[in-house]
Amino acid sequence: MLHKKYRPNVAAIIMSPDYPNTCEIFIAERIDIEGAWQFPQGGIDEGETPLEALHRELLEEIGTNEIEILAQYPRWIAYDFPSNMEHKFYSFDGQKQRYFLVRLKHANNIDLNKHTPEFRAYQFIHLKDLLKKIVPFKRQVYRQVIAYFRREGYLGC
C-alpha cells in the first residue's frame, strides 16, 4: 500500500455575526470551479501555526479576519482529492486540515476581491442546507467536524 501525502491546511466554519440567534454558516463559491461551494481554507506556510494560518487565510480569501474563535477540532482530518479533479497540488494526494469554528464579527467587512480572488460569490446558509450545497468530496469531512462541534456543545443548532 502506498503512503499518501497530504498538504497541511486550515479550514474555517464561519458562523454569521448573529450566531447563536441564527444558525447561518458562511460558504463561498470557488472562482475556478462554478458551483463548487465550500468553507474558506488554505495551506499552512512553513513556520506558521494553524491559528496564524487561519487569520492569514481569512484575510486573503474573504477580506477580513475579524472573528471570535469558538472552538478548534482536536485532530487533523484528511480528505483525498477526487481522481478526476485537476488540482494545483500535484505532489499531494489530498489535504489534512485543522478546523476552527468561528463567529464573524462584522459581515459588512467581507471583501472577496481584497487579494487575489479565490471565490466568486458567498452566502450565509442555514446549517440544515449546508451539505446540499457543498462539493461531494468534502461532505464526509464537513459532517464529521460539525457533528463533533455539536456533540461537544460548541455548535448549538
Swiss-Prot record:
Q: Where do we find the motif Nudix box here?
A: 42-63
CDD domains recorded: NUDIX_Ap4A_hydrolase_plant_like (cd03671)
What InterPro entries does the entry give? Answer: Nudix_hydrolase, NUDIX_hydrolase-like_dom_sf, NUDIX_hydrolase_CS, NUDIX_hydrolase_dom, RppH
The yes or no answer to whether the keyword Heme is present is: no
Q: What class of enzyme is it?
A: hydrolase
List the GO cellular component terms: cytoplasm
Q: Which cofactor does it need?
A: a divalent metal cation
Q: Which GO terms describe its biological process?
A: mRNA catabolic process
The record places domain Nudix hydrolase at: 5-147
Q: What is its EC number?
A: 3.6.1.-
Keyword Transcription assigned: no
Which keywords describe this protein according to UniProt? Hydrolase
**GO molecular function terms attached to this record:** mRNA 5'-diphosphatase activity
Stated family: Belongs to the Nudix hydrolase family. RppH subfamily.
Q: What does this protein do?
A: Accelerates the degradation of transcripts by removing pyrophosphate from the 5'-end of triphosphorylated RNA, leading to a more labile monophosphorylated state that can stimulate subsequent ribonuclease cleavage.
User: What PANTHER family does the annotation carry?
Assistant: M7GPPPN-MRNA HYDROLASE
The identity of this protein, by name, is RNA pyrophosphohydrolase
Q: What species is this protein from?
A: Helicobacter pylori (strain Shi470)
Task: State the taxonomy lineage.
Answer: Bacteria, Pseudomonadati, Campylobacterota, Epsilonproteobacteria, Campylobacterales
Q: Which gene encodes it?
A: rppH
